[in-house]
Amino acid sequence: MEAKATARYVRISPRKAREVIDMIRGKNIEEALGILQLTPKGATKPIEKVVKSAQANAENNFEMNPDSLYISECYVDEGPTLKRFRPRAMGRATPINKKTSHLTVVVKEQKEG
C-alpha cells in the first residue's frame, strides 16, 4: 500500500528542488523531516509540507503505521514558466523566466523482517 501527495505550481526552480529532494529519497519519514529542517535551502519548506501531507494521507486514508513509513518515490517535474520582462537602458528589455515545479512524494510501509 502506498500514499501519495503532490504540490503543483510551486514557485521554486526544478533544479534547486531536485538538489534537496535527492537528499531524502529512500529515507525514513522522521529522518527525512530532520534532514529538511537542518538544510539551509529555500526548497526545503514546500518539500517538507508535501512530505508531511503524504504522511498524513498514509495515516488517515490508508491506516498505515506512521512509525514504519519511508519515502519510496519522490521527484520534481517542471511546471510552466512565468515570463516577465525587465526594462533596461536605451529602450531595451530583457526577459526574466520565473520557473515553477510540481513536487511528488510517495510513501510506503516498511516490511518487517
Swiss-Prot record:
Record GO cellular component, one term: cytosolic large ribosomal subunit
InterPro entries found in the cross-reference section: Ribosomal_uL22, Ribosomal_uL22_bac/chlpt-type, Ribosomal_uL22_bac/org-type, Ribosomal_uL22_CS, Ribosomal_uL22_sf
Top-level lineage group: Bacteria
Keywords: Ribonucleoprotein, Ribosomal protein, RNA-binding, rRNA-binding
Molecular function as annotated in GO: rRNA binding; structural constituent of ribosome
Family matches, as SUPFAM superfamilies: Ribosomal protein L22
Gene Ontology biological process: translation
Keyword Zinc-finger included in the entry's annotation: no
Cross-referenced PROSITE patterns: RIBOSOMAL_L22 (PS00464)
Subunit structure: Part of the 50S ribosomal subunit.
Function noted in UniProt: This protein binds specifically to 23S rRNA; its binding is stimulated by other ribosomal proteins, e.g. L4, L17, and L20. It is important during the early stages of 50S assembly. It makes multiple contacts with different domains of the 23S rRNA in the assembled 50S subunit and ribosome.
Family: Belongs to the universal ribosomal protein uL22 family.
Protein name according to UniProt: Large ribosomal subunit protein uL22
Organism name: Natranaerobius thermophilus (strain ATCC BAA-1301 / DSM 18059 / JW/NM-WN-LF)
